[in-house]
Amino acid sequence: MASNSSSCPTPGGGHLNGYPVPPYAFFFPPMLGGLSPPGALTSLQHQLPVSGYSTPSPATIETQSSSSEEIVPSPPSPPPLPRIYKPCFVCQDKSSGYHYGVSACEGCKGFFRRSIQKNMVYTCHRDKNCIINKVTRNRCQYCRLQKCFDVGMSKESVRNDRNKKKKEAPKPECSESYTLTPEVGELIEKVRKAHQETFPALCQLGKYTTNNSSEQRVSLDIDLWDKFSELSTKCIIKTVEFAKQLPGFTTLTIADQITLLKAACLDILILRICTRYTPEQDTMTFSDGLTLNRTQMHNAGFGPLTDLVFAFANQLLPLEMDDAETGLLSAICLICGDRQDLEQPDKVDMLQEPLLEALKVYVRKRRPSRPHMFPKMLMKITDLRSISAKGAERVITLKMEIPGSMPPLIQEMLENSEGLDTLSGQSGGGTRDGGGLAPPPGSCSPSLSPSSHRSSPATQSP
């Protein structure tokens, strides 16, 4: 009778009850075939082997330790089937296991943990009965948290988990040493200052709201669009000011400065507004304090881009980026040698290298036990570029939806760099503030030139 393979020890070189057992390269323990019940062993000792080998009795095992007969193993047991969890009890997404008492996905697990650890208080803007599924789970934190409780997630499990982590011995730090040299420290401070001077933090703003189309999505709310486009224009100006303060940026040719600004402007705008995301209310705040919910952002002009931007904002939350990290990531987005039509891509790469090194050292100094955070931040640049590509498409459709013309600076900044000559050659092609200056051949429109004096220190950005 074959024994249960899961309880058999894995054979290796040595003896089993005094009998030599050759090693087998099976992942699962092999089953030894042909073993008869003990009572029948004596009568079978002198019979010819049925399957090409003999089955020795205990006595034979003791007296034939030098025998050349082999014991042929049976085929290994099949590997166990992978564990299949029920879908997430909260949103029905793919579950990653049992978390805090129920089958849950990584998203709902993290949301519940953060909500309990930070004692979050959410508000439902509807009737406190929102449908929570994979698509809608980020729209109402109040109802999502209530559903977490309804399906059985445990507060105590979160607290116990946190206490357990506190008692654990600290993990050894990464063996690689990251020294914050004076040069790197000075670069970080310059970028931090450039970011803070052109983009005030959320805690510095006096937030206010508007009731315009806050409940139902429409194709475009003209009043919201007018306000949003005004703030976006100011934000573009502030982005240019930020670029001019980055070490080495103004040493590039004017054409390369314009190419980089046009290519990265939307990346930086999205990154900046997403750092002003408030998950409790599912809102974003502009630099004048205007705070819009998801529906209002859609109606202000974001349209189909809205959910992508809010999803990205949620992905930034676990990174807990400060001003230095946001500024460095913005600078890396901007000063990037793989942009098309650069005159000096090698010089741009040389300017980017110290920024990458500064971000790596700063992130790993700030989070010594989490070495994976630096690559995770860099991966956000790929996400930003993907959203920006869709944002450029959205600008094209917006031109057909808005009653008037697109604000000149927004249109000019989001035009492909190949369209510069066309823009420059237009009569009356000046912006609201820059006038209709005609640039010399090979240069760019003056409204985008980093040397332009259009911006004012008092101007705020979104």
From Swiss-Prot:
Protein name: Retinoic acid receptor alpha
Stretches for region Required for binding corepressor NCOR1: 404-419
GO cellular component assignments: actin cytoskeleton; chromatin; cytoplasm; cytosol; dendrite; neuronal cell body; nucleolus; nucleoplasm
Cross-link (Glycyl lysine isopeptide (Lys-Gly) (interchain with G-Cter in SUMO)): K166, K171, K399
Membrane-traversing stretches: none
Induction description: By retinoic acid.
Major subcellular location class: nucleus
Residues recorded with modification Phosphoserine: S77, S96, S219, S369
Protein encoded by which gene: Rara
Chain positions covered by the region annotation Hinge: 154-182
Statement: the UniProt record of this protein carries the keyword RNA-binding: no
Keywords on record: Cytoplasm, DNA-binding, Isopeptide bond, Metal-binding, Methylation, Nucleus, Phosphoprotein, Receptor, Transcription, Transcription regulation, Ubl conjugation, Zinc, Zinc-finger
Ranges of compositional bias, category Low complexity: 444-462
GO BP annotation list: apoptotic cell clearance; bone development; cellular response to estrogen stimulus; cellular response to lipopolysaccharide; cellular response to retinoic acid; chondroblast differentiation; embryonic camera-type eye development; face development
Segments of skewed composition (Gly residues): 426-437
Result, substituting S77A: Decreases phosphorylation and no effect on interaction with CDK7. Strongly reduces transcriptional activity
Tissues showing expression: Expressed in Sertoli cells and germ cells.
Residues that hold all-trans-retinoate according to the record: C235, S287
